[in-house]
Every structure is written in structure tokens, then in C-alpha cells.
């Protein structure tokens, strides 16, 4: 297992211009893969004597280059310079970069150091959703104005394999359908293809850098109770409107919420976009595309289809389509398909 010492952390801080006689370290997160991908991600809260606490990130990801890591840091700093609250990332002393190349525990790794942000957002309510939407819109404005780019794939690109809806996984189930269910599956597939053809102009829009994961655990409250964000690990280039729609539904459905919540998912969606449009109004073309993109996301939402990531399928909920297919229950399959078809042909306006 990967290990590091206080002496190692002191040397890292020295590279960032922090000279402290002692420090305290608390490991907050670790992903140390022993399989062939060999990925490593360790996040450590380091408090040097006489200095505010910092977050030191140690990474070894064979799929992400130093160029990508540095671009993510520079994008975060570009937002901060334009007034967007982020965790400031320290530059390496005497060098025009933020990512430090280091050898730790006989392993070459990339290292960054950034400010530790207090007051992490713990749950999302309507007011918080408005603020998250506003924050995202402001960051989009800066990214577009400053022509920011990060050469990395994102989680929420609706024209690629993504983390919110599984249209391609739905299509792969076609060879397990029979009778009327096979016919309905084909009708859904055709409607999906028609919608994606209509969305093609959206696909062709220019892409700009986005933070890529505006979740509760990546956001913090500022001293005046606005919201900022940190963790640009998933930052990359996306069509800004697509990022807005995907992030809005992500915030409304897959966050932590108050136990005594009195609001619906749709209340959160509307709140998020109310905040977003206050800083970056949707264009008439956006409003035309929204019902189509929303229909695809709602129909093939992860919980509707079932997980198929990694080795084989692992349905996340019993009511997922794949669960019905796996149970060889044609009536349940039909109900799921009808629900998916109804969502795909619904046209929710913004």
C-alpha cells in the first residue's frame, strides 16, 4: 500500500514556499488501486505550524496526463481571478506551474496543494440549489469570456457515454426483448435517434472548460453565505448549455437532502435553473433544445435502466429495466418500457 511520511509532506510544502517546523496531517480520502489500472488518489489535510490548513493531493492516474492536471489547476485559478470562489491552488516556487512532479514511496506521482475550505455544503435545499445554479452560470460566463479549455473528457456530456443516463445500455438490451416488448424497444430506439438528430446543432456548439462535478461535497459556503466550489478533478471541456442541464438534474436528484424535505426534485430543478438564468439566461435556441435533451435524460436516467459499468450488470434499484429483464418478467419489462417511452415523448419546458 502506498505510504508517505511527515518528512515527505514537509518537502512538498517547501516546494510551494511553506517552511514550517512541524505539521499535522489527516488523510481525508484514498483510492489506492491494486489492480492493473494502478490508479492512486490520496487527499490529505495538512496543517503546517503557523500557517492555515491546506489540502495536498497526491495522484497517479495513467489515463490523465500532467498537462490535464495543470490545465485543471489553471482553470480553477482563472475562475478565482474573475471573482468565482474557489480553493486557491499554490504555484510551485520559482516555476510557472502548480503540479509538482515527485517520487514518493518509490512511485512517480503528481502533487498539488490548495487552500482548505471550511463550511462544506452538507445537503441541498431550494435556496442552495438557486445558489449552485448561479455559481455554475457565473463560471460558464468566465470560461467563455476567457476562452478557457481543459483537454479532458467530462462526466456529463450527453453526446458521449456519461454518468447520468444510459441510452447506449438501453439499446444493448434489444437482443433480449421478445414479442410486443421488442416492438416497443424498437419504437423507443427510433424516437431516441430522432431526438438526437434534432439535437445535432447543439452537439456542434463550441466547448469550453467546466468544473464538471458541482455536487454538495465539492461546494462550500463563503463568509457571506454564497457558494464556491473546489475539486476540479473532473474538469474538462463541454458544451456549456449541456453542462447546465446535466448539472441541474444531477443536483436535483443525486445529492444529499434534508431529512425533513418538503420540496420535490422538480422544485430543485426549477430552483437551480432560476439561479442559472439569473446570471446566464437561456437563449431562444436553448429553450427549444431543453425539452428534447430533458426527455432523453429523464427516459434513460440511470435508475430507470440499471448499471452496466465494469464487469456485467448490477442494477442499482429493483425497478430498473435490467432487473425486470434479468428476472425474465415480460410484464414488468413492458411496464418499464412504457414508462421510458412516456418520458421520452414528454416535452418539459424550462
Language-model-detected regions and their locations in the chain:
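A cross-family kinase active-site recognition segment
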Residues: 123-182, 207
Amino acid at each position: 500500500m502506498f505510504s508517505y511520511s511527515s518528512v515527505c509532506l514537509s518537502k512538498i510544502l517547501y516546494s510551494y514556499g511553506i517552511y514550517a517546523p512541524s505539521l499535522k496531517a489527516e488523510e481525508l480520502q484514498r483510492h489506492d488501486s491494486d489492480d492493473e489500472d494502478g490508479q492512486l488518489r490520496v487527499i490529505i489535510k495538512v496543517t503546517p505550524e503557523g500557517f492555515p490548513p491546506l489540502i495536498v493531493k497526491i495522484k497517479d492516474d495513467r489515463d490523465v496526463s500532467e498537462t490535464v492536471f495543470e490545465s485543471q489547476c489553471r482553470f480553477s485559478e482563472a475562475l478565482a481571478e474573475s471573482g468565482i470562489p474557489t480553493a486557491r491552488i499554490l504555484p510551485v516556487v520559482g516555476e510557472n506551474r502548480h503540479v509538482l512532479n515527485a517520487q514518493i514511496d518509490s512511485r512517480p506521482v503528481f502533487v498539488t496543494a490548495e487552500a482548505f475550505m471550511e463550511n462544506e455544503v452538507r445537503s441541498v435545499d431550494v435556496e442552495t440549489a438557486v445558489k449552485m445554479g448561479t455559481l455554475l452560470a457565473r463560471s460558464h460566463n468566465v470560461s467563455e469570456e476567457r476562452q478557457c479549455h481543459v483537454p479532458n473528457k467530462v462526466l456529463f456530456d450527453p453526446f458521449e457515454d456519461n454518468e447520468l443516463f444510459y441510452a447506449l445500455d438501453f439499446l444493448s438490451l434489444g437482443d433480449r426483448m421478445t414479442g410486443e416488448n421488442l416492438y416497443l424497444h424498437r419504437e423507443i430506439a427510433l424516437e431516441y435517434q430522432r431526438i438526437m438528430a434534432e439535437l445535432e446543432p447543439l452537439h456542434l456548439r463550441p466547448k469550453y472548460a467546466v468544473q464538471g462535478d458541482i455536487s454538495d461535497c465539492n461546494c462550500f459556503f463563503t463568509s457571506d453565505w454564497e457558494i464556491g466550489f473546489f475539486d476540479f478533478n473532473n474538469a474538462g471541456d463541454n458544451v456549456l448549455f449541456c453542462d447546465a442541464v446535466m448539472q441541474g438534474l444531477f443536483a436535483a436528484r443525486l445529492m444529499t437532502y434534508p431529512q425533513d424535505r418538503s420540496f420535490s426534485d422538480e422544485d430543485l430543478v426549477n430552483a437551480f435553473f432560476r439561479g442559472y438564468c439569473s446570471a446566464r439566461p437561456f437563449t431562444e435556441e436553448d429553450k427549444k433544445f431543453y425539452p428534447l435533451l430533458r426527455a432523453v435524460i429523464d427516459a434513460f436516467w440511470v435508475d430507470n435502466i440499471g448499471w452496466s459499468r465494469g464487469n456485467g450488470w448490477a442494477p442499482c434499484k429493483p425497478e430498473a429495466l435490467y432487473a425486470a429483464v434479468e428476472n425474465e418478467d415480460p410484464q414488468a419489462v413492458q411496464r418499464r418500457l412504457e414508462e421510458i417511452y412516456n418520458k421520452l415523448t414528454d416535452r418539459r419546458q424550462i
